[in-house]
């Protein structure tokens, strides 16, 4: 969609995350019976993915599943959870560490109803941020249950961006891209941090310095 093609060769097995049990290993890191998790490394894109009964994968792509969580629980997070965690901590902690404690209070999350967005809303809320959730779906109660303080329609941001607008946010997690990201950049306060991780709307970013 929108020119952002990930899979280039077919036939192909998708599935960017998987969790399971090792049945055969040529690696010293893992042995038969080990429970593992795979996330990232472009598995499901340039390598065959996890939508299969068995998967052959580079051992460097794997980690042992921590005790205390099930494979199902691990996959509830997966790539979406890992991405959300990285974005949330980057948005909040980078500013507070690099700028000697300058706090991140007001944050906007786009695509807030999606996998990455919903987890980012939860994390940022737990970190004490005032979270604005931008979404195309009529699910205000759901987003508020995750910790969102304010809900806006994504359409309010999906338009040609002005060169500069009113500073509203100390930080942002954008999962959408395109005009929405361009508009967010104009609304970020001085020294703000934006973590952009998606291009569902567009791979083009029309902005200005």
Task: Enumerate the language-model features and the residues they cover.
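Short amphipathic alpha-helix with an adjacent loop that forms part of the alpha/beta core around
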Residues: 157-167
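Mid-domain Rossmann-like dinucleotide-binding core that forms the NAD(H)/NADP(H) cofactor-binding site
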Residues: 75-156
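Glycine-rich beta-strand-centered segment in the early N-terminal region that forms part
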Residues: 2-43
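Residue-level marker of beta-strand positions
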Residues: 34-36, 54, 126, 130, ...
